Amino acid sequence: MAQGSRAPSGPPLPVLPVDDWLNFRVDLFGDEHRRLLLEMLTQGCSNFVGLLNFGVPSPVYALEALVDFQVRNAFMKVKPVAQEIIRICILANHYRNSRDVLRDLRTQLDVLYSDPLKTRLLRGLIRLCRAAQTGVKPEDISVHLGADDVTFGVLKRALVRLHRVRDALGLRASPEAEARYPRLTTYNLLFHPPPFTTVEAVDLCAENLSDVTQRRNRPLRCLTSIKRPGSRTLEDALNDMYLLLTLRHLQLRHALELQMMQDWVVERCNRLCDALYFCYTQAPETRQTFVTLVRGLELARQHSSPAFQPMLYNLLQLLTQLHEANVYLCPGYLHFSAYKLLKKIQSVSDARERGEFGDEDEEQENDGEPREAQLDLEADPTAREGELFFFSKNLYGNGEVFRVPEQPSRYLRRRMFVERPETLQIFYNFHEGKITTETYHLQRIYSMMIEGASRQTGLTPKRFMELLDRAPLGQESEPEITEHRDLFADVFRRPVTDAASSSSASSSSSSASPNSVSLPSARSSSTRTTTPASTYTSAGTSSTTGLLLSSSLSGSHGISSADLEQPPRQRRRMVSVTLFSPYSVAYSHHRRHRRRRSPPPAPRGPAHTRFQGPDSMPSTSYGSDVEDPRDDLAENLRHL
């Protein structure tokens, strides 16, 4: 590419440190929960999460759009809830780090605008206003230089006055300075950059913001503080006024954004409780942790500055218990399935009260199915109590969605169950120019749980409830799940791979002749080298341990790289400096330099023609000289 037609280089990207814990704070998360967060996140997104955790000042809405990550396959069953909890953890961690940035900014601004530098700044402002002679008083500007409440309206009014002074003096921003404006939002997306007129002023402001965001403990600087008295110009005084006014407004805006982010983190937890309630019904052993979480949220809403550590601890503790329950968390789908089943039961009950099912011939609905089919009743002939009927569409009867916990009397008795009277299914309609809603109360969630538990234990719901009441007294034993593993194939059995068979064969040959030396075969030499588990998983992860254990049980002495979780292929994530969309420009800038992908290879294997293929027998309806269209298709495939 020629030098003249070369695309202009983009603004420098920020360099932010990411530690081994992805910048998760130790005062918010314990070591156990930090390890859990690292195990749930893939390797491909770890650096990006560390960048978000660093606390670069950003608007809340921009940060919500930027938070992105992937969850490992080992946590697939809890993924719907894990994604929301991880997002809350990232927002809370970002809030605490960004709050430290604001504290440093306030301290250094007060140090900057103090004597003796304050006196020199005011003298420069007086000389600036006198030289312009526009009627702008120095007091109109200086009153905001030490204030903590410089709103956006106050900032605009002060900038209008400074622009009048600038125009009267004939000062304009140089093209070199305008080209460096994007640097001003590299380390702070909340900063409203003023029109600095010199390159030196732009670079100095960018360095100040970089030092504050990265918490380097360097004092803020201005042109008046770094230049000698004889070398200061009116343009330097103008740029210093720009710097102080915009930093004072940044201080206020940052504080307001942190207040909104603090309340938003609590609100996200509050909204998550709707899904966590159905997760609790799927794993009743999480009752105590769920109740503690809700009580903590109630206290957090009553304080102006809630502590995030207890709330985050309960969230991650609940997620750990849900992961150990080994059920598929699907709160939204479970909510809808409960509504469908309860509505069907209610409609059949209402029809029975109206006497619509009096005769056998009348037990047909509009679609021609009998009432039993409409109720979705299913017989269980393998139950110990004889022939039982259960609702086939009750998800609580599925062991992969709801599993009866150990000692069910501790969690499934009526007085131990956490009721939620206002469980609503809401439908939205549009009527006469307005959005209207229809609500349906789900009042039998506990009955559905008992019905599903009785199906898994092979008991009637009445008998199951009796055992729950008598088991704590020692009169009856706890109900247990009826296993039917011998009726079905074991799909979780680990297959014996080629590496396992070759290793077992070599071990048997070596044991038969201890003095003999076996050479590797051609098949084993062409196989791919096994990649160690530490390449893809963190130390001490349960997935690696599970792979090692399962391979040892199946007789395999090596782990195939296909069994290990690899980081997904992702686009390169880079920080841009465009205001409110900081991670999009870099990709579009480098997009043109990508190499074009090669076309896909031609399909392998024999093509279907009239001479070969599944229907190569000659047809009697056509003559032998009739062309078959498959011949042309095969010829075209050969020339691809």
UniProtKB/Swiss-Prot annotation:
Keyword Lyase annotated: no
Composition bias type Acidic residues, residue spans: 358-367
Region of interest (Disordered), ranges: 353-373, 500-571, 586-640
Bias (Basic and acidic residues): 631-640
InterPro entries per UniProt: Herpes_pp85 (IPR006731)
Compositionally biased intervals (Low complexity): 500-562
Stretches with biased composition (Basic residues): 588-598
CC terms in the record's Gene Ontology section: host cell cytoplasm; host cell nucleus; viral tegument
GO biological process terms held by the UniProt record: DNA-templated viral transcription; symbiont-mediated suppression of host cytoplasmic pattern recognition receptor signaling pathway via inhibition of TBK1 activity; symbiont-mediated suppression of host toll-like receptor signaling pathway
Keywords: Host cytoplasm, Host nucleus, Host-virus interaction, Inhibition of host innate immune response by virus, Inhibition of host TBK1 by virus, Inhibition of host TLR pathway by virus, Viral immunoevasion, Virion, Virion tegument
Domain of life the protein comes from: Viruses
Family label: Belongs to the herpesviridae pp85 family.
Name this polypeptide is given: Protein UL35
Organism of derivation: Human cytomegalovirus (strain AD169)
Lineage of source species: Viruses, Duplodnaviria, Heunggongvirae, Peploviricota, Herviviricetes
